[in-house]
Amino acid sequence: MPKAKFFEGNYPENNNSEQEFVEKYIKDKNFKENWTILHSTNIHDPGAGSWKTHGELDLIFINHKYGFIHLEIKGGGYSVEDGVWYKRDKGVKKRLVKEQEPVQKLEVKERLLRNCFNNIARGKSGFGDRLKNDEVKLLPIVSFIVWVY
């Protein structure tokens, strides 16, 4: 079984969730399929011109057969009460504004990722030299939040 091509980025300070997930499930692991995995990747929609559409994605799994799987890794501290999201910060429970809720942020990042790859597939440059236009096909993108406690 092949190992994934893993491009490791920087881990967030004061948050071990991503690193623990990578160590447990990705690094030095064998996969049944050939995957390219990008960690902590900054993206920009090349079709947006000068608009600021930057975003950081925790993990992107890329496979020619299955498409793109986008994972956002979240540690503890989140809770939901009556549809309202909260995050515990330094022991204090704070209500999150709608734009900062994990599901909302995931949807925004998935839309940015979809636009980025669709524009690259149409010939716009993107993702530096990691992906070439002819390597990107219009494949499905699936996004998940992974809760690590």
Question: Where do the PLM segments sit?
Answer:
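Intrinsically disordered, low-complexity Ser/Thr/Pro/Gly-rich regulatory segments
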Residues: 1-149
